[in-house]
Amino acid sequence: MKGDKKVIQHLNKILGNELIAINQYFLHSRMWNDWGLKRLGAHEYHESIDEMKHADKLIERILFLEGLPNLQDLGKLLIGENTQEMLQCDLNLELKATKDLREAIVHCEQVHDYVSRDLLKDILESEEEHIDYLETQLGLIQKVGLENYLQSHMHEDD
């Protein structure tokens, strides 16, 4: 089914954000695990997998619309050097992604592509949940201090 060119452009832009997130979150996960912060590492690993699932759905949709998924133009990863920076980098990426998602949703509405719109709304909901998690973690660091925060994230949840 031939899709709207601008919808395909939006889907590819969102796909690019997801590809950045997959790699960024995966690296952050491994860094936290290496530092002994197993709870943070496990959570970040699952976020990376969620982003991979989003990318998969976007690729399927782009192909269905007879577009070409762009997996080559990988943007810059935002890699922190410490836990607080890493959380902030993830938050910055998610805030950009949600802005792009909202713009894409508006366009899909305008051209009556409700299937793409619904896919993007599902991804937006997931990204908003991640933003809430990241804001909560950064808030906890402010409330309990970095050392207490880090100590509470040394062991994985059972």
From Swiss-Prot:
Fe(2+) Fe2 binds at residues 51, 94, 127, 130. Pfam families: Ferritin (PF00210). Its cofactor is heme b. Disruption phenotype: No growth phenotype in iron-sufficient conditions, cells do not store detectable iron under any conditions tested, cells secrete less pyoverdin siderophore and deplete iron from the medium slowly. Very low amounts of FtnA-only BFR complexes accumulate in vivo at low O(2) levels. Its EC number is 1.16.3.1. Fe(2+) Fe1 binds at residues 18, 51, 54, 127. Induction: 24-fold increase in transcription in response to iron treatment. It catalyses: 4 Fe(2+) + O2 + 4 H(+) = 4 Fe(3+) + 2 H2O; Fe(2+)(in) = Fe(2+)(out). One of its GO terms (molecular function) is ferric iron binding. It comes from the Bacteria. It is found in: Cytoplasm. Its main location: cytoplasm. Each BfrB homodimer binds 1 heme group coordinated by an axial ligand from each subunit. Residues 1-145 form the Ferritin-like diiron domain. Heme b binds at residue 52. InterPro entries: Bacterioferritin, Ferritin-like, Ferritin-like_diiron, Ferritin-like_SF, Ferritin_DPS_dom. K(+) binds at residues 148, 151. Keywords: Cytoplasm, Heme, Ion transport, Iron, Iron storage, Iron transport, Metal-binding, Oxidoreductase, Potassium, Transport. Changing residue 151 to L: About 70% active in Fe(2+) oxidation and storage, diiron-binding site does not coordinate fully, loss of bound K(+). GO terms for cellular component: cytosol; ferritin complex. Gene3D superfamilies: 1.20.1260.10. Small molecules designed to bind BfrB at the Bfd binding site (derivatives of 4-aminoisoindoline-1,3-dione) cause cell death in model biofilms, and are bacteriostatic in planktonic cells, suggesting these compounds are potential antibiotics. Model biofilms were tested in strains PAO1, PA_1081725 and PA_1076058. The bacterioferritin (BFR) complex is formed of 24 subunits (FtnA and BfrB) arranged as 12 homodimers. The holocomplex contains about 8.7% Fe and 8.0% phosphate. A pure BfrB BFR is a hollow shell with an external diameter of 118 Angstroms and an internal diameter of 73 Angstroms that binds 12 heme molecules and up to 600 Fe(3+) ions per subunit. The BfrB-only BFR has twenty-four ferroxidase pores which serve as a conduit for Fe(2+). The major iron-storage protein, part of the heterooligomeric bacterioferritin (BFR) complex. The ferroxidase center binds Fe(2+), oxidizes it using dioxygen to Fe(3+), and participates in the subsequent Fe(3+) oxide mineral core formation within the central cavity of the BFR protein shell. Can store up to 600 iron atoms per bacterioferritin protein molecule. This is Bacterioferritin BfrB. It comes from Pseudomonas aeruginosa (strain ATCC 15692 / DSM 22644 / CIP 104116 / JCM 14847 / LMG 12228 / 1C / PRS 101 / PAO1).
